[in-house]
Structure formats: structure tokens, C-alpha cells
Amino acid sequence: MADKLKIGVIVGTTRQGRFADTALEWFEPKIAARTDLDYEVLDLRDFALPMFDEAAPPAAKPVTSPAAQAWEKKLLEFDGFIVLTAEYNHSIPASIKNAFDYAFKGWYRKPLGTVGYGGVGAARAVEHLRMIAINFGMVPVRGATTIGGADFVAAMQGKPASEWGDHLDAPTTEMLDDMVFWGNAAKTAKG
């Protein structure tokens, strides 16, 4: 049997009162139950990345910011990523875009899964993130988890996940299965 994949679960919003903590609390038991992968939570709050101000993109030249160097080094530890994202003004939060802009090798040829949340389940943000990921040579997986509409409202009202999240188990399992498939395919191809 192949080594377990190591997946970075990125908490993508950094604002006070963020819903990301609720989404992570719901999602983490799902990924923790998997026997075919390991994971680590990467909270963007913990990396203190400055706004991107490098002379060239990381694909062309190594970054100079010590925080960005630590970020890229951390990303290199993983076989794929799942980003928990809100939708801000029909797109991803600036914190996620900035985190992508500060790295290249850490993202390259790895699968990307998403857990989106908001009024429409962050559908537009998820699609935008998938387009960004392709630019980094990533494989955005088909499966996705979207916490939207009535589910999002119920969660915001503090209702337990058992009242709003059980029907999200199937798409979450599909996304995690896709992550394992594409993560193993990428590892095999890279040798």
C-alpha cells in the first residue's frame, strides 16, 4: 500500500468573527476519519504574510519575505490542499489570493479541494479558486463541499451540525475520494 497522502487544510479567512472556524469544526472530523490520508490545518492567521510586494512572481524568482519563505517551505510538505473559503464580493478573500501569490513550487502539480461557505455556498469563489489553481499547475478536483443557503443560515444561528450538515457528507466524501485519487496519481507521475 502506498504511503498516506498528507493534505494541508487551509483556513482561508483571517477576519474577526469568521465562519471558517465553524466550517472547520464541521469538516475536521470528516477528514480525520479517513484512513488513506493525513492532514494538518494551516490557518492563514498563523503565517502573517504581508501583502504581495515581491519584485517577481515566485515562479520566476524565489521570494525574499521571511514569512513567505516559511509559507512556501510549509507548503512543500504536502501532497495536496483543501481550502476553506468564504465568498467576498463574488470571489475569494484577499488572504487566499495573497497566500497563492506568495508561492509556486508548494502548489505545483497537486490536487486542490474546497469547502465553500456563504449565501450561495461560495460557488463563485470556488470556481475562481479553481481557475487560479490551474495557473499553478494544480488539479482542482470535481467534488466540492458547499455550505450555503439554509445550511449556512442554520450554522450562523448556532444550530448543531447534525441539524444542517448531514446531507453534506456524500459530497464531502466524493471530494476527499477525488483528493486521494489525484494526489496518488500526481505522486506516481512525479516519481
Predicted regions and their residues:
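N-terminal beta1-alpha1-beta2 submodule of the flavodoxin-like/Rossmannoid cofactor-binding fold
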Residues: M1-T85, S91-N98, Y102, K159-F181, ...
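Short, flexible coil/linker segments at domain boundaries that flank nucleotide/cofactor-interacting
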Residues: A2-D3, W107-R109
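Short, proline-centered helix/strand-breaking motifs
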Residues: T85-A86, P111
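Glycine-rich nucleotide phosphate-binding loop and flanking beta-alpha elements
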Residues: N89-H90, G121
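Short, well-ordered alpha-helical segments in soluble proteins
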Residues: A103, W107, A133-G137, G183, ...
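Short, glycine-/small-residue-rich phosphate/pyrophosphate-handling segment
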Residues: Y108-A154, D166-P171
